[in-house]
Amino acid sequence: MFQDNPLLAQLKQQLHSQTPRAEGVVKATEKGFGFLEVDAQKSYFIPPPQMKKVMHGDRIVAVIHTEKERESAEPEELIEPFLTRFVGKVQGKNDRLSIVPDHPLLKDAIPCRAARGVQHEFKEGDWAVAEMRRHPLKGDRSFYADLTQYITFADDHFVPWWVTLARHNLEKEAPNGVATEMLDEGLERQDLTALNFVTIDSASTEDMDDALYAEELADGRLQLTVAIADPTAWIAEGSKLDNAAKIRAFTNYLPGFNIPMLPRELSDDLCSLRANEVRPALACRMIISADGTIDDDIAFFAATIESKAKLAYDNVSDWLENNGTWQPDNEGIAQQIRLLHRICLSRSEWRHHHALVFKDRPDYRFVLGEKGEVLDIVAEPRRIANRIVEESMIAANLCAARVLRDKLGFGIYNVHTGFDPANADALAALLKTHGLHVDAEEVLTLEGFCKLRRELDAQPSGFLDSRIRRFQSFAEISTEPGPHFGLGLEAYATWTSPIRKYGDMINHRLLKAVIKGEAIARPQEDITQQMAERRRLNRMAERDVGDWLYARFLNDKAGTNTRFAAEIIDVSRGGMRVRLVDNGAIAFIPAPFLHAVRDELVCSQENGTVQIKGETVYKVTDVIDVTIAEVRMETRSIIARPAA
């Protein structure tokens, strides 16, 4: 009799609308219970039985119950699941398979089966890609997943690489395809094969995309010609190879190997500016005054060049510093190195005064064995030869930015607008507490930003610099010319790495249109989004593989007294993150390792400090000695403690 009773339905509706609810994100703990985080201030307890319906990271709506003044959340509706596509390790065999997601806070095995069309017979320990098919909040009895791709077996030495690439859905190998002959682009190429062009790279580099040639003019000024590899001479816009490069957007550099944007035949051979091989190039000629200013008379042109020497950073640096035994092959090459060194010094000086120069940080290189084992991690400081190439490339990219802006009004630009205007007042207030006075309006201009950066660089430590980093906006890729505050330049458009960056290939095509005096369409906006997304994924992949290799490398140091110098890079409520100076590994120091009495300890992310009994004991940028307490291989995390 109550079946279709409208009064009962109304009562139910009323009760439903009067019951308090909250939307938020589920945070799991290792103890079975969890929390519904509504915002930074408010969270609700989720009891263990209710946690069985949800997963860490799910965005849900929950009913809020109050019992004996204690609030708890009962998950009711799924807004957005945390897991859709994921990688994990298979458990069980035959018909009873499950998969444990490869995530530090997801420990439970999810029942699964191989999806239709997947041929592999999965067994214990296999790595796989899975997709969620069922969720308790969608009316299903339990969680369930399909295995959509086999990655590799448990003991594969190269698990870090294959699993990471599968996780981010990135390619594992070079694209297929060959370029049979050069295109007829209607370009006249200047024959520069007689000139002493040189390339300077790491000794192991195969994809050389820049060659340099310098000469001194009669009036004492220096003329620099930057010749860049010319893949668009082989790859037509809209072709199969072009579309593959557009999707990849960048060569993906991972520890130990790279996955190129172009077929290796092009990237490492046909386009690579190899010594004593004639190659097509796109070139830029500029004149540099004694104070480092680049003349307005910038020339872009198509050329044919022949590099006369493949030089290595360390050899060139040693020779300029009068160290080591290496010598240039002949006086012509020696003269090139000397002239390029002069250009580097004057451009560096100009950028110090008129733009901004980054602080030098070492690059960390993993030395790997045949089986992917980490033999060593080497810190490679940026030396004078690295700076020669860097200054030449920045100058060339500045020239391209100007020419594209003035001739076309568009291009692929790297744009960075400094501080977010919404943060300007908070930034000025923070700086004031440290004795630096800035105008909140002025600091949003390129000039004001540069002025502040120079003041910060003059500080005795990088502490204040680290405090204001959170107020900065992110660099973007844009088709519209705009300033690059980080470099302190009015505009910046890269074209010097077309073998490894699709945006540089686009700029090549635009520059060629300028050279020929032809009209050309503005690049589509969606390409900048694809490039930004790929850059993000490639960086995450590099970090993930690095974390895995660092954990392998430091595993045997866990629990020993081996000391490492470490720079504090972040403070949070739970402790501090540090970077080991010698190898670049990131480790976490939990708060209890800093001081045993929790009430006497204040870890402030806001201030970047750790206080014990009111005294600041640690702050961001401090370098301290640590030992490795534990390496958790399953989550690739390194736990350190201050050395006694």
UniProtKB/Swiss-Prot annotation:
One of its GO terms (molecular function) is exoribonuclease II activity. Residues 561-643 form the S1 motif domain. Pfam families: OB_RNB, RNB, S1. It catalyses: Exonucleolytic cleavage in the 3'- to 5'-direction to yield nucleoside 5'-phosphates. The keyword Methyltransferase does not apply. GO terms for biological process: mRNA catabolic process. SMART domains: CSP, RNB. Its EC number is 3.1.13.1. Belongs to the RNR ribonuclease family. RNase II subfamily. PANTHER family: EXORIBONUCLEASE 2, RIBONUCLEASE. Involved in mRNA degradation. Hydrolyzes single-stranded polyribonucleotides processively in the 3' to 5' direction. NCBIfam families: 3_prime_RNase, PRK05054.1, RNase_B. This is Exoribonuclease 2. The lineage of its organism: Bacteria, Pseudomonadati, Pseudomonadota, Gammaproteobacteria, Enterobacterales.
